[in-house]
Amino acid sequence: MLAPPCFMSEPTEPPPIRVPGLRIVATPIGNLGDVTMRALEVLRSADLIACEDTRHTIRLLQHYQIHRPLISLNEHNEARRSPEIIDRVRAGDSVVLVSDAGMPTVSDPGQRLVHAVVKAGLLVEVIPGPSAVLTALAGSGLPTMPFYFGGFLAHKKGARGTELAAALQRECTSIYFESPYRIISTLEILAGLAPEHQIVVARELTKRFEEFQRGTSQSVFQHFSAKPPKGEITLVIAPREMPKWASPKATEPEP
């Protein structure tokens, strides 16, 4: 006697009702496998996807066989594009906002658009996902709460030095994005200001050559001076005073 056919059980929650609005979708920061099922569902159902760089986003969409209309939304055209997108939402469309990696609006384009959509009284929905900031913080081994995120460090060396000096005096962990072309200069500044201060350089997060280089600012500077890094970089700087459990001299965990 044949066994009865096996069917998948009904989902515990019904699929989300598709209504007009702006959906802010976090995308992978390196590993395409990190995209969430909900993000894929929202992308597949979008009437329009506004992305930082269409060439970058199309690679993600092609990987998951998603074919939806795209427009660019970046720092150069956001003010002009925002009214167009608001008109699409008012007309009944579901518009998705993505950046090249991670959460849109956070050190990426989109905050002016979101402000305008909120001001217009229209729906804004966030689909969370990968974050370079939280990934670097969680893997740093430094205190995670509280923390300060300063976005990209200043391009000019003088302004960058001022930012780094402030970070060294904070009572919390500080996190910044930095370019591989400036990281050696940045580490040199840190080594000059506080050579024994604990820092972490997180590089190529979630990718094949992911690296966490931990140590004093002097040792990390020396490491990368000998072998300049490539790829996306997140810099994590320890607070001015480390808690007892995280002190380099600590030998036993607190009870």
Name what the model sees in each region.
Residues 4-75:
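Glycine-rich, flexible N-terminal cofactor/catalytic loop recognition
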Residues 9-11, 19, 94, 172-255:
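A contiguous loop/helix-start segment that scaffolds small-molecule binding in enzyme catalytic cores
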Residues 43-49, 121-124, 173-174:
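Short active-site oxyanion
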Residues 51-52, 108, 177:
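Short beta-strand scaffold positions
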Residues 55-57, 102-103, 132, 182, ...:
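Alpha-helix capping/helix-boundary segments
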Residues 71-74, 82-131:
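Glycine/small-residue-rich loop that forms an oxyanion/phosphate-binding "nest" at active or ligand-binding sites
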Residues 73-79, 153-156:
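Conserved helicase motor
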Residues 112-170:
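Class I SAM-dependent methyltransferase SAM-binding "motif I" and its flanking Rossmann-like core
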